[in-house]
Swiss-Prot record:
This is Carboxypeptidase S1 homolog A. It comes from Trichophyton rubrum. It is a lipid-anchor; GPI-anchor. One of its GO terms (molecular function) is serine-type carboxypeptidase activity. Substrate binds at C461, E517. Keywords: Carboxypeptidase, Cell membrane, Disulfide bond, Glycoprotein, GPI-anchor, Hydrolase, Lipoprotein, Membrane, Protease, Signal, Virulence. Extracellular serine carboxypeptidase that contributes to pathogenicity.
Length: 652
């Protein structure tokens, strides 16, 4: 990895006292200096911003790592200030296991998962208040949400003055030495990271190295977490299909080095006792999943015909033809194996080859879908998709919330610097040391539970591709997993939430009526799956102890494609100022730009948007829904949005 010789001196940061929009000065934080390194520290505050259950504690804070030599001997000339939000379990936190939650991107904040999916609260439509989530994942598990790599979400290198464009969702470094410009609907001011793409990890493996150093500090020195249960799990989503396998396998490798005394440095010898890796709608490996981008829009269980047969076949041709997607990815991986075997991304030739593969696959796979005007994260929704609701962005913009959190920077959902850094080296086309499917196999051989969970309406990391990954793994239990069949996921006495193939510690689950962010669509189903896996129960019923019956396998049907779904009603459009590029019509964007829009609690009331057209089908109505149980459970109202995809590896 190459780092800039220096980082520009940060502009003086103007605080809330002099300009609206900036975070207030940080006060009342607890500072814990590392007993291993005087330059390392943790700062944090206890608060009840989201978790309001009596007696249940939660903490927001940062782990601060100074500039230092990286693991491969190159000087890292920037600080890493990694944000965390820790929620104790609502039940028996001292004896509860702990799970890390990571969203993907690369560059997406884990506040997406916290507020739109599985955290203790939902943010209401007013963007100011919250509602308790009874299906929160911290009901029985201690949850640690982390913004990573550096500059993502509330994580930062150096606080820097910025402007934010609501029209195109972009952040720019600003010079306010001559005064702060007036804010309007299209331009806001605040404090963020440097936006320097050299001041963050530039690939998945380097992100794994960084998060391991964070974990060494947090698990040894954060004083508010002293559990009797030392098990650690990682649950992740989307680009987390790469983060999860790479991070977990790196943790496991480091554990082995600590045990055999290869690692002997004081402060870096804490065993991270891995229990589970969970991946929700993960984009894991292009070579397994690329074909699904052609097939899923053409032939899915909702009867949606987004592609013609001719279009599907043309995309498959572009995947397989000479110098097509697969050819370029193969060349990238061969070049990386030869020229960048340790995955530092410091070989310019390899970076160019892999970035070209990344861009080519994006062109062949993603560009055609843009023409459908359907949702990347929910094929049954329009492209301008208001679900899950983006109200948490306004909530996290409140001065009182930022003060209670002790954050010196404003929130940003997506870190442009991280995206540029990863895309510039072609990270999505690359493998890591074993390949990400090889990582999953390694973890299974090491006794770690692995769960793949996919909502069946997601396009961007769809369940067709996820199933191919599950069947393509090569480990000692491969044949047993293939012999297992699909069984119902029984959520309660009246509702079946999906189907699962499971053998022992490995499972693949298709969740009905869910898009990319499964817990946001099906909170009860997602919670049942999560808790059953975490507590060693079978996913189908929750009644069989997998630890006692390690050879357990599901029985049922070989395939699930015969289970068809109804297309849901189109969600009511909601143009949200802080997600304008993904939730607003061109007319509304123009009104925001010229200042004529009527806005209430970040929602554009005028001009109003019309409801989108239903997705195309071959029949007047699809076949019956998969269950006769109760209607699906949803989070209260309705999505975050990102810019139209311009690169393949731009996921949540």
């Amino acid at each position: 990895m190459r780092f800039a010789a220096s980082i520009a001196v940060a502009l003086p940061v103007i605080h809330a006292a002099s300009a609206q929009g900036f975070p207030p000065p940080v006060k009342g934080v607890t500072v814990v200096k590392s007993k291993f390194d005087e330059n390392v520290k943790i700062t944090y505050k206890e608060n009840d911003i989201c978790e309001t259950t009596q007696g249940v504690r939660s903490f927001t804070g940062h782990v601060h790592l100074p500039p230092d030599n990286d693991d491969f001997g190159v000087y890292r000339n920037y600080s890493i200030n990694t944000f965390f939000w820790f929620f104790e379990a609502r039940e028996d936190p001292k004896n509860a296991p702990l799970s890390i939650w990571l969203n993907g991107g690369p560059g997406s904040s884990s506040m997406i998962g916290l507020f739109q999916e599985n955290g203790p609260c939902w943010v209401n439509e007013d963007s100011k208040s919250t509602t308790n989530n009874s299906f929160s994942w911290n009901n029985k598990v201690n949850m640690l949400y982390i913004d990573q790599p550096n500059q993502v979400g509330f994580s930062y290198d150096v606080p820097t003055n910025i402007t934010y464009s609501t029209i195109n969702d972009t952040i720019s470094v600003a010079d306010f030495s001559n005064g702060v410009p007036a804010q309007n609907l299209s331009t806001l001011v605040g404090t963020g990271s440097s936006q320097n793409p050299w001041a963050t990890a530039n690939n998945t493996v380097n992100a794994a190295r960084s998060i391991w150093h964070f974990a060494q500090v947090w698990f040894q020195e954060f004083p508010e977490h002293k559990p009797n249960n030392n098990k650690i799990s990682i649950w992740t989503e989307s680009y987390g299909g790469r983060y999860g396998p790479s991070f977990a396998s790196y943790f496991q490798e480091q554990n082995e080095k600590i045990k055999n005394h290869t690692i002997t440095e004081e402060g870096e010898m804490h065993i991270l006792n891995l229990d589970t890796l969970g991946i929700i709608n993960g984009c894991i490996d292009l070579m397994f999943q690329a074909e699904s981008y052609a097939e899923f829009p053409y032939n899915n269980t909702y009867g949606i015909k987004a592609y013609t047969k001719e279009k599907r076949d043309a995309i498959l041709h572009d995947i397989h033809r000479p110098d097509g997607c697969f050819d370029k990815v193969t060349k990238c991986r061969e070049a990386a194996k030869e020229g960048d075997p340790h995955f530092y991304s410091n070989n310019a030739t390899v970076n160019t080859i892999c970035a070209d593969a990344n861009s080519a696959c994006d062109k062949y796979l993603m560009d055609p879908f843009q023409e459908t005007n359907l949702g990347y994260y929910d094929i049954a929704h329009p492209l301008q998709d208001p679900f899950p609701p983006p109200f948490y962005k306004g909530f996290l913009s409140q001065s009182s919330v930022l003060s209670d959190m002790g954050s010196p920077v404003n929130f940003s959902q997506y870190a442009q610097a991280v995206g540029k850094s990863f895309h510039g080296v072609g990270d999505y086309a690359r493998p890591d040391v074993r390949g990400f499917t090889g990582d999953i196999a390694y973890l299974l051989e090491s006794g770690v539970k692995v769960a793949l969970v996919y909502g069946d309406r997601d396009y961007i990391c769809n369940w067709f591709g996820g199933e191919q990954v599950s069947l393509g793994l090569n480990y000692t239990g491969t044949q047993d997993f293939h012999r297992a069949k699909y069984a119902d996921v029984k959520v309660n006495s009246s509702y079946v939430g999906g189907v699962v193939r499971q053998h022992g510690n490995f499972s693949f689950t298709r969740v009905f009526e869910a898009g990319h962010e499964v817990p946001g669509y099906q909170p009860e189903t997602a919670l049942k799956i999560f808790e059953r896996i975490m507590f060693n129960k079978d996913i189908s019923t929750g009644e069989i102890d997998i630890a006692q019956k390690p050879d357990y396998g599901t029985t049922g049907t070989e395939s699930t494609f015969h289970i068809k779904n109804d297309i849901p009603p189109s969600p009511e459009p909601t143009c949200y100022l802080l997600s304008a590029d993904g939730t607003c019509t061109p007319e509304q964007l123009n009104a925001i730009k010229d200042g004529t829009a009527v806005v209430e609690n970040y929602i554009i009331k005028s001009p109003a948007a019309s409801k989108g057209n239903p997705p195309p089908t071959t029949t007047s109505s699809p076949t019956a829904a998969p269950t006769a149980g109760s209607a699906m459970l949803k989070a209260p109202v309705a999505m975050l949005a990102i810019s139209a995809l311009t690169v393949l590896a731009f996921f949540l």
